[in-house]
Curated annotation (Swiss-Prot):
Probable common Sm protein, is found in U1 and U2 snRNPs and may be part of the spliceosome. It is found in: Nucleus. The lineage of its organism: Eukaryota, Viridiplantae, Streptophyta, Embryophyta, Tracheophyta. It comes from Arabidopsis thaliana (Mouse-ear cress). CDD domains: Sm_F (cd01722). InterPro entries: Lsm6/sSmF, LSM_dom_sf, Sm, Sm_dom_euk/arc, Sm_F. GO terms for biological process: mRNA splicing, via spliceosome. It holds the Pfam family LSM. GO terms for cellular component: Sm-like protein family complex; spliceosomal complex. Belongs to the snRNP Sm proteins family. SmF/LSm6 subfamily. This is Probable small nuclear ribonucleoprotein F. One of its GO terms (molecular function) is RNA binding.
């Protein structure tokens, strides 16, 4: 699957209020509700789970991720969110 370049500010604004996965340069992933994005593209996530090497390591609640640590951000499809809710 090919990736298409997207302007980051509208992309992040469209993801605000939805569940996202943020991967850091260091390999950790955070899955949570994107509460807000500032002008520097720092990310505030709520109800956040931390994953290291694909394994859930803990629930962190509300976190702030500084922009320069982010490798990528992706939205979580709604059907994937529903599957996760069913597992709980």
């Amino acid at each position: 699957m090919a990736t298409i370049p997207v302007n980051p500010k509208p992309f992040l604004n469209n993801l605000t209020g939805k569940t996202v996965i943020v991967k850091l340069k260091w390999g950790m992933e955070y899955k949570g509700f994107l509460a807000s994005v500032d002008s520097y593209m720092n990310l505030q996530l709520g109800n956040t789970e931390e994953y290291i090497d694909g394994q859930l390591t803990g629930n962190l609640g509300e976190i702030l991720i500084r922009c320069n640590n982010v490798l990528y951000v992706r939205g979580v499809p709604e059907d994937e969110e529903l599957e996760d809710a069913d597992q709980d």
